[in-house]
Amino acid sequence: MLDNLIGARYLTGLGTITAANTVTVRSRVDGQLMALHFQEGQQVKAGDLLAEIDPSQFKVALAQTQGQLAKDKATLANARRDLARYQQLAKTNLVSRQELDAQQALVSETEGTIKADEASVASAQLQLDWSRITAPVDGRVGLKQVDVGNQISSGDTTGIVVITQTHPIDLVFTLPESDIATVVQAQKAGKPLMVEAWDRTNSKKLSEGTLLSLDNQIDATTGTIKVKARFNNQDDALFPNQFVNARMLVDTEQNAVVIPTAALQMGNEGHFVWVLNSENKVSKHLVTPGIQDSQKVVIRAGISAGDRVVTDGIDRLTEGAKVEVVEAQSATTPEEKATSREYAKKGARS
């Protein structure tokens, strides 16, 4: 009975894990660092308190601006009362028009002063708020860049700590420019393209994500294009600057017969494979290939699941020749698993 599995085509490339966002946390004000409220390496949320700068000078500045605002508000209230009296007296010509205009100008001037005072209060309040430094994004904090007690300033380029956003996290890898059309066509199908991250030795799958974007230009020097995939990474299997192998699924076929690419040959009559019968004798079968990559190919017609195909020594074969079957060794990597199969498999998985 045939298994209802899938023949899959993958594009592969080398890449590096990058944080979704990397932020150097800096102070916006100058002052003495009083406290750090994080542990190196911990996960933080946007808005979490990370550090405090001595707020004394900012509290004093705020009190001064608030006092000036209160004083000028009192002056404005008095000026408005005088203006009201002048307006009444002007009706009986007890004050001149010039005196009335001067009082009106004084009120307008004081109103402008009030607006300036309010801006000064807001600025002083902002300076005080900035003495409490919070996380701008979710992420993992790195090693602290400054110790408590040091004077810091808004001009410090090293900052206090660096936050890398790892939930989610991105993988940037490269593909040959010849693969661009394949990726674009797969994107137009409307379904997210699955991307797998494998370790440096290509022996262990670390995580699964989806294609995020293609770069907008090809690197003319290398003939490649950068591709970005995004991973949820809740298990922290991926880490910034980690080197990985990427495998992107771009096409699938249901109920597919899959054979190693090495078994597929090309002759005058078209594509063919050598098939072994129960007596280990070979016969040529014309086939119709489908999607393929460097390691395996889908066969749409010409052989069936369970047929045995020859992958080595093909140039020495003739019709009806009897061959010695050598069992394939166990495979460990995705590529080895694809090439080690001697049998045509229904929806063989890598």
From Swiss-Prot:
PANTHER family: MULTIDRUG RESISTANCE PROTEIN MDTA (PTHR30469:SF12). It is a peripheral membrane protein. Residues 334-350 have a biased composition (Basic and acidic residues). Belongs to the membrane fusion protein (MFP) (TC 8.A.1) family. It comes from Shigella flexneri. SUPFAM superfamilies: HlyD-like secretion proteins. The lineage of its organism: Bacteria, Pseudomonadati, Pseudomonadota, Gammaproteobacteria, Enterobacterales. GO terms for cellular component: efflux pump complex; plasma membrane. GO terms for molecular function: efflux transmembrane transporter activity. The gene is mdtA. This is Putative multidrug resistance protein MdtA.
